[in-house]
């Protein structure tokens, strides 16, 4: 998409990019390094960390933190622990509030724009 003329100044949302401030989150640098190394070894055409990769990785971080915190794999125990605690992830600090269980966090969602063929957080 970045190479198409029609995509100039396109907007998208993101929760993770391979630059600051995203790379300051706990484990982000090692996550990026590992993703690049494994992607290159697998001969992937692109080894850039994208939104979906970071969400998947953070999901496992959340599950690990909840299982360790609740000392259980019971879904009700995990949910109860998550409602009372936050999880520091590669996407930043995550927490859950209210009946919807919507993932919250300070400034998690950002807008990025395609500028000169590169995505830039605006």
Annotate each predicted stretch with a short phrase.
Residues 1-57, 119:
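Extracellular/periplasmic periplasmic-binding protein-like sensory domains
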Residues 38-121:
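Segments of small-molecule ligand-sensing domains
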């Amino acid at each position: 998409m970045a190479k198409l003329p029609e995509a100039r100044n396109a907007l998208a949302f993101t929760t993770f990019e391979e630059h600051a401030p995203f790379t300051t989150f706990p484990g982000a640098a090692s996550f990026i390094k590992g993703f690049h190394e494994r992607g290159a070894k697998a001969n992937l055409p692109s080894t850039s960390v994208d939104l979906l990769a970071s969400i998947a990785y953070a999901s496992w971080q959340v599950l690990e933190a909840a299982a360790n915190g609740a000392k259980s794999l019971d879904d009700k125990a995990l949910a109860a622990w998550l409602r009372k605690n936050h999880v520091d992830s590669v996407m930043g600090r995550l927490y859950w509030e209210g009946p919807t269980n919507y993932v919250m966090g300070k400034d998690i969602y950002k807008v990025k724009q395609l500028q000169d063929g590169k995505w830039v957080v605006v």
